[in-house]
Amino acid sequence: MAANTDPRLQNQVIYSIYVRNHTSEGTFRAVIPDLDRIRALGTDIIWLMPIHPIGVEGKKGTLGCPYANRDYRAVNPAYGTMEDFEALVREIHARGMKCMIDVVYNHTSPDSVLYREHPEYFYRGPDGKPGNKLGDWADVIDLDYSNRGLWQYLTDTLVMWAKLVDGFRCDVASFVPVEFWLQARAAVAAVNPDCVWLAETVHRSYGCLARRHGVYSASDGEVFRAFDLEYEYDVREVFDQYLRGEVPLSRYLDALSFQEACYPANYNKLRFLENHDQPRIASFVRDERALVNYTAMLYFLKGTTLLYAGQEFENDHLPSLFDIDPIDRRTGRDLSGLLRRLYAVKQQFGSADWFFADADDVNDLALLQRGSAGKRFVGVFSLKAKAADVRVDAADGVYENLIDRSAVTVKNGILSCTGEPVILRAEG
């Protein structure tokens, strides 16, 4: 963890918005009327996916990918003006939330302002042409961090935005030198000492692939030196395997236990069921009670919770990044009430809890514990919504299920799970 990371981040919730698809208008100002609803979910930070102009050369789809950035220092005119953006940030702040923007510093679009002004800042392949160090992406070209002039340009850009916003979600942060992030963090701290830094670290297999091809890829442990929290892609592949029925639940929970063993006690992973790069969880989990269990487990896990806009409506369609594809708020159930209750439960947890995970593979039950400073919480999550008797680490007695205030009985060390999620506070 960064030396000055705010421990309160552990129990906060980030809500991710893609401006183009959040409303039918697709503008900064059109987001504003929805802010009260978003705040009421228990949102602490709004993360706006890339707000900058999008490249045209090699673009994907009709409108291009927002991660093919054409100008780091401007806003996408399709979303509005800089004044419109500033108005949105003010309204976010007025509701007690922070605003985080996307930082895409691994690459730009081929027709970017930066490439036009400083072609020397870009990686060139064996043919001498700008391109990609790994893979072949038509809509982006990679930056070359061996040029220190690039470091200064990007750092100055971050300082500019840090005077307006409260944090940065840094795309493919593992492929950018950690020393650059440390320099940038120090410079930003001079104008915004409370800035929140979120790293999109890469999937374990992708990081290994990069290294096999001689491409720099920092480990999650290295990235933590400069960041407050980072993606949980180090365990995501195992989670996806469980969703597809390829491995038992215990494999995923063992991966969570490995995180607990190999990171500092106050490590903070961004926990999510879905994001703009991952399929909607509702497209995998069709049983509504099972989906409630997954959602409750998400909030119980150690780390900051991420909600991707539309998740609260059980959307099963992942919106396109490249075309107009507004969120449909009429699909599935409205989980807003559940999310509010889970947020209230999350506020009871410690900021550097110990965490323990066990599994009942026969019944697909996740048996989790966390605690600190004399507090201990037990969570039972039935990921296939099965009813089963399960042994729990809690004294016999009647407990309050913190999720819905119902009574839960433990007798002879056994809790009778009805298929609904349970979180209780235990002694010791």
Language-model features: locations:
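Carbohydrate-interacting/catalytic domains
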Residues: 1-47, 53, 86, 90-92, ...
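Substrate-binding/active-site clefts of carbohydrate-active enzymes
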Residues: 2-15, 19-44, 50-162, 183-192, ...
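Hydrophobic faces of well-ordered beta-strands that scaffold small-molecule active sites
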Residues: 13-15, 46-48, 99-101, 168, ...
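Soluble or luminal CAZymes and related metallo-dependent hydrolases
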Residues: 27-30, 80-84, 149-153, 176, ...
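Short, solvent-exposed turn/loop segments enriched in Gly/Ser/Thr/Pro and often Arg
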Residues: 47-60, 102-111, 171-177, 200-204, ...
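Short, surface-exposed connector motifs at secondary-structure boundaries
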Residues: 162-169
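Active-site-proximal helices and loops of the catalytic beta/alpha 8
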Residues: 171-264, 269, 297, 316-350, ...
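Active-site clefts of carbohydrate-active enzymes
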Residues: 263-286
